[in-house]
Swiss-Prot record:
NCBIfam families cross-referenced by the UniProt entry: dcm (TIGR00675)
EC number: 2.1.1.37
Leading EC class: transferase
Source species of the chain: Aneurinibacillus aneurinilyticus
A GO term, aspect molecular function: DNA (cytosine-5-)-methyltransferase activity
Protein name from the UniProt record: Type II methyltransferase M.BanI
Annotated ranges, domain SAM-dependent MTase C5-type: 3-417
Lineage top rank: taxon: Bacteria
InterPro entries in alphabetical order: C5-MTase, C5_DNA_meth_AS, C5_MeTfrase, C5_meth_CS, SAM-dependent_MTases_sf
Gene Ontology biological-process annotations: DNA restriction-modification system; methylation
Length: 428
């Protein structure tokens, strides 16, 4: 039997690869009869790997060949925690209704939709309920799973929702929602894996001999050495950001705007740790504090000299006789050094190029190939030749391994509903 499928919002083809792998396990042939992707650079990568050019804007595709299965990772931005939660009010938010149109007009047997975890809680859950209701109105039974890539042998903390539907039947699944460890520290302790494979870590995806172009600059390495000396492996798991919180390195510790004394560093660290306390107000990012308020937690006899110096260097600003650190995300080559013995934070299109690792005591950025491995792409997958586009595309993509396992589970437990009396190979 040949399964004909449509690949909408195809990106670089991550969902397709997972789907085709799952079908192959059951010795099922597949044929993509239509793919659609609006991003031209993503289309270039898709064409390199699948030898076909996706069609463009879904709004302009009015007719489809006959097909059995719809794949659609409709765009994340409207529902993502990483961006503004605009939802259906945003133009991109209405793209779900294009999915609805395709299902209504073509009535395929089944579908897989993928989206960000924010879809579950968006608008207090009403957005997801709306989506499921619309799908059920079309005659589809619907199930969904909230899954973390890190529990599928892929060392990335990436929680996504997978919505599955079968025409006339609610999908039966053995997989259950599992969001995995909340962060890399808990993952390191819990070592979660849903399958027989041992749990994966960042060191498993590192290239042996990455190009020198990914090595951090001498200037940046020099700044880092002010904090860790020559033992750069101490950077494992650290982020570079001017906010409070564990495992953070700040601009004043690196001397970005000028070297700071130990007292100045201690003062700024105390200031960001204390300024959000309720006794000083409820402003989310911390209130500017008076000299008197500062003395309640940092009563140094040279406090005024320290403050004057930090004002001159630009680490501190004065607002009506109150003081606040000049905070923000720093435009460094790397904003987070991954712990090789744990998992990566979630790859995103905007900052995949700024994730780093220390390998053989050398700080560097992770490579596009390593990003691809964090998404479960095979090493023979051809990446875009421009690194900037490759990082963006991989940050926007899906984790291939999760799609593969979800589709395997769907096929395994819904043979009659999907394939009638046909006997599938390798069904347990």
């Amino acid at each position: 039997m040949k399964i004909k499928f449509v690949d909408l919002f195809a990106g670089i083809g991550g969902i397709r690869i997972g789907f085709e792998r799952a079908a192959k396990r059951f010795e099922l042939e597949t044929e993509c009869v239509l793919s659609s992707e609006i991003d031209k650079k993503a289309c270039e990568t898709y064409a390199l790997n699948f030898k076909e050019e996706p069609q463009g804007d879904i709004h302009e595709i009015t007719s489809f060949p006959e097909f059995d299965f719809l794949l659609a990772g409709f765009p994340c931005q409207p529902f993502s925690y990483a961006g503004k939660q605009q939802g259906f009010g945003d133009t991109r938010g209405t793209l779900f209704f294009e999915v609805e149109r395709v299902l209504r007009d073509n009535r395929p047997k089944a579908f897989l939709l993928e989206n960000v975890r924010g879809l579950v809680t968006h608008d207090k859950g009403r957005t997801l309920k709306t989506i499921i209701s619309k799908l059920e109105e079309l005659g589809y039974g619907v199930s969904y799973l909230l899954l973390n890539s890190s529990t599928f042998g892929v060392p990335q903390n990436r929680v996504r929702i997978y919505i599955l539907g079968i025409l006339g039947s609610k999908p039966k699944l053995t997989l259950t929602s599992n969001v995995g460890a909340a962060d890399s520290h808990k993952y390191k302790n819990e070592q979660i894996s849903l399958f027989d494979e041992s749990y994966a870590t960042v060191k498993d995806i590192l290239e042996d001999s990455p190009s020198e172009k990914y090595r951090c600059s001498d200037e940046f390495i020099g700044q880092l050495s002010k904090v860790v000396g020559n033992n750069f492996e101490l950077l494992h798991g650290y982020r570079l950001i001017d906010y409070r919180g564990g495992n953070s390195i700040h601009s004043w510790e690196l001397g970005i705007k000028g070297d700071c004394t130990k007292e100045e560093i201690e003062f700024l660290n105390q200031l960001i740790a204390n300024r959000r306390k309720k006794i000083y107000g409820t402003h989310q990012d911390g209130k500017a504090l008076t000299l008197e308020q500062i003395r309640t937690f940092y009563n140094h006899d040279q406090l005024e000299v320290i403050i004057k110096s930090l004002l001159q260097k630009g680490y501190l600003r004065e607002e009506e006789n109150k003081f606040n650190p000049v905070c923000g995300n720093m435009s460094f080559e790397v904003f987070k050094f991954l712990d090789p013995d744990s998992i990566s934070i979630t790859l995103t299109s905007s900052d995949a190029h700024k994730l780093g690792v220390v390998q053989n005591n050398v700080p560097r950025r992770i490579t596009p190939r390593e990003c691809a491995r964090l998404q479960g792409f095979p090493d023979d997958f051809i990446l875009h030749s421009n690194d900037n586009f490759a990082y963006k595309q991989l940050g926007n993509s899906v984790t291939v391994k999760v799609v593969e396992k979800v589709i395997e589970d769907l096929f395994q437990n819904n043979v009659n509903e999907l394939f009638g009396q046909m006997k599938l190979a390798n069904v347990v």
